[in-house]
Amino acid sequence: MDWYSTLIGGLIGFISSIGTLIVERLLNQKGKINLYAKIVYEHQYGKNTWGFWNFEDEIALNVPIWIEFQNLSNSTRVMRNVNLLLYKDGNRQQELCQINRSGDREKKFDFANDGSYSFVIEPRSIQKYECHFSLKRSMRKAECFDEIKLRYFDEKDKEHILHLGSVNGSWEVGDFPRSGEWIKLKK
């Protein structure tokens, strides 16, 4: 009978330790990822902000942007394939091109995470990246757009789409209005 109570006690201890590990893991994953964005001037010359520019005898949409990730959880988070999407009347039109680097060999600058638009965000941390997105007029799929959204995939490959700004996407050279402030991106 003594060995029976020892076995039951050991089994209860084993099950409770597994339960504690499961609860602890769930609590560590609690917490949100917040994304903030700041529209800035392009890196190389510092004179153009987001909008339509003349580029190599063609109009191009350019979005130089700082993106800040705030991981408020106790676990490492993954933000994969961060990109900007164009919308018209709530319908997705197309995605922009992620610019990996600018400059020449002597003055090379890598955007995002050394040219990659996927990020590993450490627990309870804030990380800022300088990114640049672009789309030439000849590559567009729609005549115009009225909204730009940011999209990423998390560590479970779930798609997240957040509103960046409402704009007049008529493909006429000029800058979009910008506040110069950090904005919290929301659905």
Provide a role label for each language-model segment.
Residues M1-K187:
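Membrane-aqueous junction of the first/signal-anchor transmembrane helix
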